[in-house]
Curated annotation (Swiss-Prot):
This is Uncharacterized protein TC_0873. It comes from Chlamydia muridarum (strain MoPn / Nigg). Gene3D superfamilies: 1.20.58.1050, 6.10.250.1130. It comes from the Bacteria. Belongs to the chlamydial CPn_0803/CT_584/TC_0873 family.
Amino acid sequence: MTTKSKTLEIDNNTFLLLEGNLKRIFATPIGYTTFREFQNVIFNCAQGQQELANFLFEMLINGKLLQELPAGQKQSAQSLIVQFMMLIRVAKDIHERGEFINFITSDMLAQQERCVFLNRLSRVDGQEFLLMTDVQNTCHLIRHLLSRLLEAQKNPIGEKNLQEVQEDLDSLRAHFEELTKSM
């Protein structure tokens, strides 16, 4: 269990400055540079004090007060955490993984003697894409992605990543077996 160290000396204006800058940042949509803007605000508000910068960063990312604060400042800190922690976490996610797939949904339609799938993909950054496939295109896409996994297996990091998703791979195998048995 960690214990909080001495009371941190923070100028009261630091909280006002931090709040104003964060409101400005999040008044516009979150993008790839939003997290970097947040980091710059932290460093500017800390005025070169690394201990203060670390405290503010940890406070706003994880909601933790690593050191004691006077009662009034503790209330200001808690208010900033409530207002901005989730927004900052989303900004961090977008900065680190914005182009990754966040959600996929599909609808199947019958269209002139063939099944067509309307596949909607949503990225972490909120962008959405529509990918229309039929059975043949879907098989082509699966074949391509499987070949990418086989390629990843040849790389030590990729092999480790594949071991981490072994249950998913077993599930895929079972689905393929079910599909081929029913034909």
